[in-house]
Amino acid sequence: MSFSAAPTESFDVIVVGGGHAGCEAAITAARLGLNTALFSLNLDRIAWQPCNPAVGGPAKSQLVHEVDALGGVIGRLADATAIQKRILNASRGPAVWALRAQTDKRLYSRQMLQLLQHTPNLALREAMVTGLETTVAGDQQRISGIRTYFGSVYGADAVILTAGTFLGGRIWVGHQSMAAGRAGEQAAEGLTETLQELGFQTDRLKTGTPARVDRRSIALDQLEEQPSDAADRFFSFDPAAWVSGEQMSCHITRTTAETHQLIRDNLHLTAIYGGVIDSKGPRYCPSIEDKIVRFADKDSHQIFLEPEGRDTPEIYVQGFSTGLPEPIQLQLLRSLPGLEQAVMLRPAYSVDYDYLPATQLKPSLETKRVRGLFSAGQLNGTTGYEEAAAQGLVAGVNAGRLIGGQEPVHFPREGSYIGTMIDDLVSKDLREPYRVLTSRSEYRLILRGDNADRRLTPLGHELGLIDDRRWQLFEDKLQAMEGEKQRLETVRLKVSDPVAPAVEQETGAAIKGSITLADLLRRPGMHAADLVRHGLADADLPLPVREGAEIDIKYSGYLQRQQQQIDQVKRQSQRKLPADLNYAGIGTLSNEAREKLTAIQPSTLGQASRIPGVSKADITALLMWLELQQRERQPLAPTAEAR
């Protein structure tokens, strides 16, 4: 295709879509000095949260920390608009600790719009983008602009598609449907056909969202309350972004036998179980129908009632998405304890939409077919605001580097959850919505949320996304952390000190003469907060500094071993695999990996790692198994008696 009309305007970068991926991409490109435009179907719904009004959770919070460490904005806005915060997996190790924040969805959107409006080099335009303009240079197509529904043409050196669920979007309530990207908003027309004309493969995916209920119609006093427990925790590493607002409670109810029977009796009325659509939905966020069918042995499922904001009565019924008809939805809601008189403000619905399988992308998120065309977010087959925001930042960075004639930034999977996600997306044939999980990373002890700044802020500063003020804060934190670690390694607690008996009682271990505070921290159950409580640490030392020093000391051996493992996997990619290797007998491999490896019989570890269905965790397990076999075959050195 080529221009048939002169461009109305021209930009360096055009971002198509104003969701979480689009906002990060546009702000990133603009901050890199590029003349950028963000096109949205509805500028009043910028960075909307159409499903769960929350940010973070397992692995997702690590992504948010990483985006912030690079200079992105999702963490800052989540901190500014949080109405409840909790630490998940607090009883487990730091590799899986996760901050989760309920956010005020309308305030979040308003603050993002204000941020976009006040970002230099960034223009906002409301329009439906229906076409892509390209030129041909040699055998390579190159993006040259976009076309809108009403015929305007805009020139650009790079275009980033972040269309979410809007391409060919169709929402379903029972067997009734309408064209829409989400409730109340029209679907985008033409862009799917344009991508197909350019040679791209597209497919369909499905997601859904539960009903919203009027808080005033719920007997909250009859339900279990879930208050905030992490008001002093934040996603951003920048203290200037920390906001401690009024916190609100969530509440918990459960499904009943009546709920389950209603669902079983009416499964045929859903679009999926009725055979009307067959798009794949998210495995890790199933509808209530899927839960009842897949977990038929369970008598009850937990349901969370989450406020959508401080100034709205709307309650999000988390864990209760459904594709059933609206009248049955109300019956289902009223079968839940505490919701017998529930008033449903908005029905649940499913949405199926076109997406672009990400194997058609480079790790930079540039498409392989069209130079200068990038894709990010739910359009790539992911699910979640956090996954979208991370991809948006990567696409924004690499669009800028392409225009500047620089090499793209590659995020290796061992360096971040961002890298893990992108590596999975571009190398695996994923046919269901992709959600980041801690289990997807074989390096999760190193890829923690608390050290995301140490892993990525130097890169953010090098790219120009971390300003001098943030860089100075980062250096000050590192200096304070090193100072605290040195203090802990040198200061000793003597058995004669007044606090020693209390410390011995808490840890269940005697102090023999004296012990360094670092060795004290290494004892199970002893934490930096306990040192503060006993007067053995400075209470004024920032929490991130105290906890960072503690984790480095307490888990130093594990961290060193995992880093060695990372280095070993890199070295071992050319390692030969025995032709007669019995993969079925390696219990640490996933079932899918055993099947694929047995069928293909790869000759090297590197070849095995590139087989779809064989995860990086499987490769690590295979490597460890090979090392164990080698040690068992290696003869022991003769003893003195044998000699």
UniProtKB/Swiss-Prot annotation:
From the UniProt record, which GO molecular function terms apply?
Answer: flavin adenine dinucleotide binding
The Swiss-Prot or TrEMBL record describes its family as follows: Belongs to the MnmG family.
Query: What HAMAP family does the annotation carry?
Result: MnmG_GidA
Source organism per entry reads Synechococcus sp. (strain CC9605)
Sequence positions that bind NAD(+): 281-295
Its biological purpose: NAD-binding protein involved in the addition of a carboxymethylaminomethyl (cmnm) group at the wobble position (U34) of certain tRNAs, forming tRNA-cmnm(5)s(2)U34.
Membrane-crossing segments per the record: none
> What does the entry list as the binding residues for FAD?
17-22
The UniProt entry, under Pfam families, shows: GIDA, GIDA_C_1st, SAM_GIDA_C
The protein's assembly and partners: Homodimer. Heterotetramer of two MnmE and two MnmG subunits.
Name the cofactor(s) required for activity, per the record: FAD
- Gene Ontology BP terms: tRNA methylation; tRNA wobble uridine modification
What is the protein name given in its UniProt record? tRNA uridine 5-carboxymethylaminomethyl modification enzyme MnmG
Cell compartments where the protein resides: Cytoplasm
**Chief place of localization:** cytoplasm
Q: What residue ranges carry the coiled-coil annotation? A: none
Q: Which GO terms describe its cellular component?
A: cytoplasm
Keywords (A to Z) from UniProt: Cytoplasm, FAD, Flavoprotein, NAD, tRNA processing
